[in-house]
Curated annotation (Swiss-Prot):
InterPro entries documented for this protein: UppP
Lineage, uppermost ranks: Bacteria, Bacillati, Actinomycetota, Actinomycetes, Mycobacteriales
Reactions it catalyzes: di-trans,octa-cis-undecaprenyl diphosphate + H2O = di-trans,octa-cis-undecaprenyl phosphate + phosphate + H(+)
EC nos: 3.6.1.27
Protein name: Undecaprenyl-diphosphatase 2
GO molecular-function term, one example from the UniProt record: undecaprenyl-diphosphatase activity
Organism: Corynebacterium jeikeium (strain K411)
Amino acid sequence: MTTDMTWAQTIILSLIQGLTEFLPVSSSGHLRIFSTLLWGEDAGASFTAVIQLGTELAVLVFFAKDIWNIASAWCKGVWEWLTDLTGKHGRRVHRQSFDYRMGWMVIVGTLPVAVLGYLGKDLIRDNLRNLWITATMLVLFSFVFILAERMGRRERSFDELTMRDSVIMGFAQCLALIPGVSRSGGTVSAGLFLNLDREVATRYSFLLAIPAVLASGLFSLPDAFSPDAGQAASGAQLFVGTAIAFAVGYASIAWLLKFVANHSFAWFALWRIPLGLAVMGLLAFGVLQA
């Protein structure tokens, strides 16, 4: 039976969302674990997706200048291309810029998760939110972080990003559809395997997440009020939760970019592995229900 979400749940889960959305620890996994551990039931994928809009807004504000430059160059570059089609050949200044190429790289990198997320929506909500899967991925994907840090040469700069990188990191972003993997964990690990500098991979990971998370949150907004979408949250709770996630998420972005400049992503395994093992133990002894 569906229950109404309390304000305590709203605040705590929104804090968790803001803290974990950008860290490679899986925000969806943490929300699934702690909502079940503290209140005995899943808050629901739709509530999670909607409050993600708060953390998404944090990315938009934090990277506003980058986003404006990319969007502006892309629009002007497309206009130059359309002008060429009419036979009025003009300058190609914007189509030769890095920001124009970055616009296409974000679009192309978003396509895999957009297609899989849309086609696999029911599978994700009905089957992949199992706590055994979440706990297992928390542990297993930690070793991917460690391997990526050891194998990656971290020598390529932001200007050296290519369309091939965007495609590979775009498919890696699809792994975030599985709770316990982490969106940033999947894309940054792929970037490290591609020998990108850690900070470069992290910044591109943020830019790549913008279309996917924004679309996911908006697409799930009507479902958040459905009795079949997990706990029922009111409009006021969704608004407050989104605001909390925004404030905490903004601080998390600033902290993470400073952290990755001098620290390995493998450090996050020290939290992921014990948490995953602890959840497995609680499941095995019947304290938690999958």
